[in-house]
Structure formats: structure tokens, C-alpha cells
Amino acid sequence: MLNPNKIIKEGDRVVMYNGKDNMAVLTMESNNVYNSKFGSYRHKNIIGKEYGSKLSSDNGNGFCHVIAMTPELWSITLDHRTQILFNLDISTIIFNLELKNGSRAVESGTGSGSLSSSIARTIAPKGHLFTFEFHEERVKFARKDFKDNGLDQYITVTHRDACGKEGFLRQDINNDIDAVFLDLPSPWDAIENAIAVMHDGSMLCSFSPCIEQVQNTCLKLADSKFQEIKTIEVLIRTFDTRLQEYEELNLTNPYIDNNNNNNNNNNIEENRGKFEIGGIEGLKKDKLLSKPFTEARGHTGYLTFARYLPNA
């Protein structure tokens, strides 16, 4: 997924793209064939091509584009083992957690790995993500996905209940975590465990679908020496735009020549002719108008952010 190469090689994971609603993830193996309603494509004919190439099917009747895997495309094409976070929330989380190359982060739970992949790209190559998941089957799938996408060196998956006694403690974590993300039914129960691995100034984010969860989380954060507590909801509002013809009001007197104070009958007749020839049509213009669509994507969840400042 973080492959900088422009040329497709054996073993690369690619996306066969035929539109936003028709994508397939493939691992390049020279002996395999990809079959779709747009035709058949032999992997050996794809290997060696540049990412972004337009490919013709074996019979020449169809085509598709082969593009490199990204966390955004992975969020669209992955198997939804759980409800996932989408790109709008993910970008907001990464920005407000102040993640960057070299950051060390903790996440719970792992789920389908959508957010994990985006965090890994942000903190690579010097940073690391420790993600915790209580569901053993999801842990196995996540480890396989991260390995297949080339992210396993940046992500460590642990099978554990983040609200339990051990929490986020590991031998390779020692109060050096820069950011913690919680996507749990009761995130307030994991805040003490989060504090155990955070340092002064670390950021915490909690994702909760219900406002009652937000209220309990904020109360716990306020009692646990967190500052700068805020909760936001991110929604897309799409606008429809179009050009509208309208008539501009003409406030000038057509019978007066402003360039000549000594008006005469010739000026009056000349200006009257110009106005009558142009008429109303000569005053029409186009203006760009917009209005929001009546239907929009609804609520996903609330994002609560806070900074740990124990000495403040």
C-alpha cells in the first residue's frame, strides 16, 4: 500500500477499476486470470505495466484501469467485518490527533482496519501503531490484511479487551504514546488504561454514535486531567449549482449624454435609439447560483477530542 514503485510487479496488490461502484482487489500472480463482466485479464499481461494504465481485455472488447492500492480505496473495497469509519471522519481524526511521521499511536478496536491503514500511512516510516481488538477472529483477519497490504511493519495487532486489567500495557510501550483512539461501546471505561501509556500533551479521540456516550466520556475526561475537550460531528453538505439568467436593473437615463453637458436634440435621439435597440435583452446576464440538495448522508458518529495535561 505504501509502495513507491510506478511499475507493477509480481506479488503487488492492485485495484482493477471500472468505476467507483465496480472495483476489485487483486494480488498479482503471473499464472492467474481476472474474470469480470468487462472481460478477462491475465496477470502476466498486467505485470510490468505502469500504475494507472488502461488495459484491454484478452478479447479486446472490454477495458479497465489498474491503479495502486491506497487506504481510501481499501476502505471502499475491504470486507466489512464491522461498521467502518469513512474517509471524512478518518481525515478529521488524523488531523486533530496531530499524527505525523514518527508518531506512536494506540487504537481500540481494530475492526475492519480502515482507520488503521490510514494511520499507518500517516506515521510511516518512523512511527508505529498498536491496535487492540477483543474479537479473536477479527484479529486474525486484520493481521492478514495488514501483511498483504505491506503495513505489518508499521502495525502491531494485539488480541485484548482494552477495558480490561492489562489495558494497553506492552513491553514495547512505555508512556511514549502520542495519540490514542477509542471506538468502544463504553470508552470511559478505557480512559484510565489510556492514561497509563500517554505522556504530557498526548491527544485522545473517542468515536461514539450516541450523544449519551459522549456525555459520559466527557465527564470522565474532565475528571482525569484532560483539557481542550471538544466534540464535533462531521457531515457532507452537497450543493447543486447552475447558471440562471437574470435581468440587471438599468438606472441610467438613456436620454442624457453624461459625456457632454450641452445636450442637444441629436444626443437625445442617438441615446434613445441605443436604448430601444438594446431593449431588455441587452441587460440580461448569467449568474451562478447554488442550493443544497434536499437529501444528504446522515449521522455517523460524534468525535470527542481531548489533550492530556496532568500538570496543568
From Swiss-Prot:
GO CC, one annotated term: tRNA (m1A) methyltransferase complex
Binding site for S-adenosyl-L-methionine: 85, 112-114, 133, 138, 161-162, 183
Compartments (UniProt record): Nucleus
GO biological process: tRNA methylation
Activity-pH behavior: Optimum pH is 7.3.
Gene Ontology terms for molecular function: catalytic activity, acting on RNA; tRNA (adenine(58)-N1)-methyltransferase activity
UniProt note on regulation of activity: Inhibited by calcium and magnesium ions and spermidine. Enhanced by KCl, NaCl and NH(4)Cl in concentrations from 0.1-0.25 M. Concentrations of more than 0.3 M are inhibitory.
Disulfide-linked positions: none
Pfam families assigned: GCD14
UniProt keywords, alphabetically: Methyltransferase, Nucleus, S-adenosyl-L-methionine, Transferase, tRNA processing
Catalysis performed (reactions): adenosine(58) in tRNA + S-adenosyl-L-methionine = N(1)-methyladenosine(58) in tRNA + S-adenosyl-L-homocysteine + H(+)
Broad class of the protein's primary localization: nucleus
Name of the top EC class for this enzyme: transferase
EC number(s) given by UniProt: 2.1.1.220
InterPro entries: SAM-dependent_MTases_sf, TRM61_C, tRNA_MeTrfase_Gcd14
Coiled coil residues, start to end: none
Task performed by this protein: Catalytic subunit of tRNA (adenine-N(1)-)-methyltransferase, which catalyzes the formation of N(1)-methyladenine at position 58 (m1A58) in initiator methionyl-tRNA.
Family of this protein: Belongs to the class I-like SAM-binding methyltransferase superfamily. TRM61 family.
Subunit structure: Heterotetramer; composed of two copies of trmt6 and two copies of trmt61a.
Protein name according to UniProt: tRNA (adenine(58)-N(1))-methyltransferase catalytic subunit trmt61a
Protein source organism: Dictyostelium discoideum (Social amoeba)
Name of the coding gene: trmt61a
